[in-house]
Amino acid sequence: MPQTESVKVLVTAGPTREPIDPVRFLTNRSSGKMGYALAHAFAHEGHSVMLVSGPTDLDVPANVDFVRVETAAEMHEVVSRYIGRMDVAVFAAAVADYTPAVVQPQKIKKMGATLTLELVRTADILGSARQPFGFTGTLVGFAAETENLETNARDKLVRKGCDLVVANDVSKPGIGFDSDHNQILLVYPQHSEAFPATSKHDLAHQIVQAIQEIAATRNSPTFQSS
């Protein structure tokens, strides 16, 4: 294993909430546990960590800078502001792909048998990392899939310029969303590596080790062997 010096790491975590009206919003089942575990693991290795998180009930890990956001637009703005200072960026958040076109200023009343909402695409935060954000460091994405796990993850890796995609099958019971455990596939440009189901805490440390090895191969001076 390469011996590492402190580097600057950005981790995103949790869901986003896209408001419909003052009392309702669109969200997803992400608990944020994997992202928070990664932030903890990076900090444990002595790195300087910024955690950008959507709404969760989790405690912020020690020795981690923390920014809380609500919406995909807010997360996009925070990431765009800070990513240029980072050596590593890990996008573990489950960011909404769509948001209501119009946020109603008052609570929508129950009228009629159906309600139609117009949704519009949110900005692609991971897809913006290389361009237009101009990030040149080690880039890691996450892929939560229900089918074609490796194929979909590899497609994301190529399209978004990632060095690594951490993929998991969220259709499997007992792992992934809401769980303290996960089963992942690390997808690299030339190969993949499967990890059996275990705690997100343990997986986070394994993922961090993998990221440190990737960064060393990118000839980052802060990740050279001592």
What are these regions, as identified by a protein language model?
Residues 1-226:
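A cross-family phosphate/adenosyl-ligand binding-site feature
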